[in-house]
């Protein structure tokens, strides 16, 4: 018994922890949601992680992303998170990919077998392609919906996308997935109405605005994703945590 995972084993059991150690999970998008999801998966004892993000750490990420420190500004998020999870669990197998998941890179990404996928991608087209491919291949997947311009972390819930309402991003995703023949899909979602942020910076190319974000909001969504993944992999959804 490893002392590092002792507290988890007390609730989940040794067989469940062994299943986690044999599991590979992919986390796509390592921002405010995905970085915390990856961190929790590593701390829970998942044996292998594939970490995917094309971006580098910027100063504006520091308020909400666990990969973002002054010492990591300018470094690839995938590499920073890979180093972080190796420090958490030296025995973990990590595949860090500094690239964008999209239709053009799909086959390269799926050259590995995954037990679960955490979809923390922001771009609709890339997100839809990933979800459709995972469903077609029978790979369990959970997706994060909108976390920007929200303040109440307690409103987040795990649910089927068909049960979402009041979230513009969820509405777009429901429409796009319906068009692809998918009506049921696991998501982390908040019905909290979006706040209107003060425009303090210019949006990057291709975006109409920059959403505001608070430290605890995307982190809570990422931790809920990790909860679902770990408990599903352990087949221990009824664990008291």
Q: Model-predicted segments: where are they?
A:
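N-terminal charged helix/coil linker that caps or initiates catalytic domains
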Residues: 1-26
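Conserved N-terminal Rossmann-fold NAD(P)-binding element of oxidoreductases
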Residues: 27-29, 52
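Hydrophobic/small residue at the entry helix of a nucleotide-binding pocket
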Residues: 33
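Conserved S-adenosyl-L-methionine
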Residues: 43-48, 136
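Glycine-rich phosphate-binding loop and adjoining beta1-alpha1-beta2 segment
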Residues: 46-89
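Conserved SAM/SAH-binding loop
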Residues: 97-106
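Glycine-rich phosphate/adenylate-binding loop
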Residues: 110-113, 124-126, 136, 141, ...
């Amino acid at each position: 018994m490893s002392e590092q995972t002792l507290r988890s084993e007390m609730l989940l059991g040794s067989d469940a922890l062994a299943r986690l150690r044999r599991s590979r999970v992919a986390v796509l998008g390592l921002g405010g949601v995905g970085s915390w999801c990856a961190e929790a998966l590593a701390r829970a004892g998942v044996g292998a992680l594939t970490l995917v993000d094309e971006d580098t750490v910027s100063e504006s990420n520091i308020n909400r992303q666990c990969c973002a420190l002054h010492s990591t500004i300018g470094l690839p998020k995938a590499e920073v998170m890979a180093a972080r999870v190796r420090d958490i669990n030296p025995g973990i197998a990590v595949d860090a990919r500094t690239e964008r998941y999209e239709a053009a890179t799909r086959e390269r990404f799926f050259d590995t077998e995954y037990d679960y996928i955490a979809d923390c991608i922001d771009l609709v087209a890339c997100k839809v392609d990933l979800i459709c491919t995972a469903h077609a291949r029978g790979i369990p997947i959970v997706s994060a919906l909108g976390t920007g311009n929200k303040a109440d972390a307690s409103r987040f819930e795990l649910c089927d996308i068909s049960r979402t309402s009041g979230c513009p991003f969820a509405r777009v995703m429901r429409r796009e997935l319906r068009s692809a023949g998918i009506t049921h899909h696991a998501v982390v979602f908040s019905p909290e109405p979006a706040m209107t942020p003060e425009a303090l910076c210019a949006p990057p190319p291709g975006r109409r605005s920059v959403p505001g974000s608070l430290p605890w909001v995307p982190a809570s969504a990422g931790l809920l994703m990790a909860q679902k993944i770990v408990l599903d992999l352990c087949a221990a959804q009824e664990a008291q945590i």
